[in-house]
From Swiss-Prot:
<keyword id="KW-0808">Transferase</keyword>
<dbReference type="GO" id="GO:0006012">
    <property type="term" value="P:galactose metabolic process"/>
</dbReference>
<dbReference type="Pfam" id="PF02744">
    <property type="entry name" value="GalP_UDP_tr_C"/>
</dbReference>
<comment type="pathway">
    <text>Carbohydrate metabolism; galactose metabolism.</text>
</comment>
<dbReference type="GO" id="GO:0008108">
    <property type="term" value="F:UDP-glucose:hexose-1-phosphate uridylyltransferase activity"/>
</dbReference>
<keyword id="KW-0299">Galactose metabolism</keyword>
<dbReference type="InterPro" id="IPR005849">
    <property type="entry name" value="GalP_Utransf_N"/>
</dbReference>
<keyword id="KW-0963">Cytoplasm</keyword>
<dbReference type="InterPro" id="IPR005850">
    <property type="entry name" value="GalP_Utransf_C"/>
</dbReference>
<dbReference type="InterPro" id="IPR023425">
    <property type="entry name" value="GalP_uridyl_Trfase_II_CS"/>
</dbReference>
<dbReference type="InterPro" id="IPR000766">
    <property type="entry name" value="GalP_uridyl_Trfase_II"/>
</dbReference>
<dbReference type="Pfam" id="PF01087">
    <property type="entry name" value="GalP_UDP_transf"/>
</dbReference>
<dbReference type="GO" id="GO:0005737">
    <property type="term" value="C:cytoplasm"/>
</dbReference>
<keyword id="KW-0119">Carbohydrate metabolism</keyword>
<keyword id="KW-0548">Nucleotidyltransferase</keyword>
<comment type="similarity">
    <text>Belongs to the galactose-1-phosphate uridylyltransferase type 2 family.</text>
</comment>
<protein>
    <recommendedName>
        <fullName>Galactose-1-phosphate uridylyltransferase 2</fullName>
        <ecNumber>2.7.7.12</ecNumber>
    </recommendedName>
</protein>
Length: 493
């Protein structure tokens, strides 16, 4: 069967198009790919594989230029043919939601995979493994899914005329957007609209997911990130409205925040993170909130966990803790709420529903810098930046490391170095490699060496989280943590 015929057959079987639409669909494909593809045969069977072959044929026919951007734009346009229009997607979602919220979520997730908005083939390239630590198993991922632009495209992106449409990659205006060299193609993108605390919000999946059913809840308006009482209201509303999903927010300050601070949004999904499994190391109750279970989590970062069947109690207590933290200083342990009227304190909040109760984890953050730590006092320090130097955002806070692609090859080089092979180790890894070699001087087994290096990456990630922790895992640090808790006001169990 010809490539075009096979692709169109798939489109008809997996959409609302009918056999009568075959000629129309064929012409839509030819208009995008080029009529020279009409007689091309294929042995492929899967829809996304057929789409990929059509894209390569378009490059061969010079219908599109040979670039990552052009490929992505055409690919999204082709997959838009199997994607219902936004109003239909929303109608279907809410009609199903009325009798089964779980099924509505599952159907939207399946659509977002089927139409290649979620890049399953790319995500499958990621390296993922777990390592033991003093805080339970941590999750390590080396992110290989996002395609890197070639140098010509990077230059082209710098030369392109500035545009503020869409204003950012999280705006509703991305739905159906054609794409350009410095903004991703979104022809096949769909967003579920819903009302939350009196405002319109959107629900979508992340194209390059870091974990199972990784999704984004985004403000319908382009407003900056802000941690406030409303954040807690919204996060708890999300876990109530989207069963089985957690919801969390990046902090709203530089250094301790995520990569996008210009558009308010939360992340969620169906995944149990290491932090969720971490137990309380100290339990207590806050005065005036006796019905809320509370405690400090055994975790490298500084986490207060609140549990209750009352959303209102959780919101009120979380807001009280946030307000106290924003103005709290303890110079004895290098904690300052502000310097020169610049605020340093905020919270990374995570909400979930567990055993019928609502749970909030509040991670205390401080974005101070100093002469000794110019990148951040509570940020990965210089000696671990060869593994992770970027901000510690929501996902890392919860115990899942997102490490750069360079580490795939570099980890293998260090393993080769440990078994005595003549390899060049990156300068920034040399001290680490020498340290591992001194600990394992007689290694000859490459697989064993690789396992040692990967475990060491995990141990370094635990150190990264400890660096980001405001209260250290020492007697002094934990005593200071309790001073803050007492400032909020507690009743000891």
């Amino acid at each position: 069967m010809t490539l075009v015929n096979k692709f169109v057959t798939h489109v008809i079987s997996e959409s609302s198009f009918e056999e009568m639409d075959r000629i129309y669909l064929t012409n839509r494909v030819l208009a995008r790919v080029g009529e020279g593809v009409l007689e091309v045969e294929t042995n492929l069977d899967k829809l996304i594989d057929l789409k990929d072959q059509l894209v390569e044929e378009a490059v061969r026919l010079e219908t599109i230029e040979d670039s990552q951007t052009a490929r992505e734009i055409l690919g999204a346009e082709l997959m838009d043919l199997v994607t219902p229009c936004p109003s239909q997607v929303n109608r279907d979602f809410w009609a199903t939601y009325a009798h089964s919220p779980e099924q509505a979520i599952e159907d939207f997730y399946q659509l977002s995979q089927k139409n290649d908005y979620i890049k399953l083939k790319a995500i499958a390239r990621n390296i993922a493994y777990r390592v033991p630590s003093d805080y339970g198993e941590l999750e390590i991922t080396i992110n290989l899914s996002k395609p890197e632009k070639d140098p010509k495209e990077i230059v082209a992106a710098k030369l392109v005329q500035a545009s503020n449409y869409p204003q950012c990659q999280l705006c509703l205006e991305n739905e159906g957007y054609h794409g350009r060299v410095n903004h991703p193609a979104r022809s096949n993108h769909r967003i579920i609209r819903f009302e939350m605390v009196g405002q319109e919000w959107g629900f979508q999946y992340s194209p390059y997911a870091y974990f199972n059913e990784h999704c984004i809840f985004l403000d319908g308006q382009h407003r900056p990130m802000a941690i406030s009482r409303q954040s807690f209201e919204r996060l708890l509303a999300i876990v109530d409205q989207f069963p089985g999903y957690f919801a969390g927010s990046n902090a709203d300050l530089p250094i301790v925040g995520g990569s996008i601070l210009t558009h308010d949004h939360y992340q969620g999904g169906r995944h149990v993170f290491p932090m969720e499994l971490a137990p309380l190391q100290k339990a207590f109750r806050f005065a005036g909130f006796e019905q809320v279970k509370a405690g400090i989590v055994k975790w490298p970062m500084s986490v207060l966990r609140l549990t209750s069947d009352s959303k209102e109690d959780l919101i009120n207590l979380a807001d009280k803790i946030l307000q106290e933290w924003r103005q709290y200083s303890d110079p004895a342990v290098q904690i300052l709420a502000e310097t020169d009227r610049t605020p340093h304190h905020t919270i990374t909040p995570i909400a979930r529903k567990r055993d019928g109760q609502f749970e909030l984890d509040l991670v205390l953050r401080d974005n101070q810098t100093s002469a000794e730590y110019p990148d951040g006092i509570y940020h990965p320090h210089k000696d671990v930046q060869h593994i992770k130097k970027e901000n510690i955002g929501l996902i890392e806070v919860m115990g899942l490391a997102i490490l750069p692609p360079r580490l795939k090859e570099e980890v293998e080089q260090v393993a080769s170095y440990l078994v005595g092979e003549a390899v060049t180790v990156a300068d920034y890894h040399q001290e680490w490699a020498d340290q591992l070699k001194s600990q394992h001087p007689d290694l000859t087994d490459k697989e064993k060496a690789l396992a040692i290096v990967k475990d060491s990456v995990g141990a370094i990630f635990a150190r990264v989280l400890e660096d980001a922790g405001v209260y250290k895992q020492t007697e002094q640090g934990q005593t200071a943590f309790m001073r803050f808790v007492e400032q909020v006001g507690i009743l000891l169990d």
